[in-house]
Amino acid sequence: MAEDLMSPTSGAIYHGYTDKSGVRTGWGQQVWPDGGRYEGEWSQNRAHGKGKFWHADGDVYEGDWRDDKANGYGLYQHADGACYLGEWRDDKQNGSGLETWADGSKYQGEY
């Protein structure tokens, strides 16, 4: 069932699917008071599956999520033009990837 929920602690507003007990499950989007936003898959109240997160500072991550963290493969684009495409583990670059900076310099390899 699709619902609108508001977190009393963070002030975030969620619009999307929940199970019978109100747990975020399936597709949904959540917006935080600072402007951060996540759209994608949820499981057990956590970002889990494919999704995209827009940070309040303009950075964007799109890719795989597990337990509310970037885990798997994804693209992180910094507001300043730098980006990283590759493997992630617990919100950190981990494994094989390509990082490109705003000045055009690049690194491809292991993190």
Give names to the regions the model predicted:
Residues 1-111:
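Intrinsically disordered, low-complexity repeat tracts enriched in Gly/Pro/Ser/Thr and acidic residues
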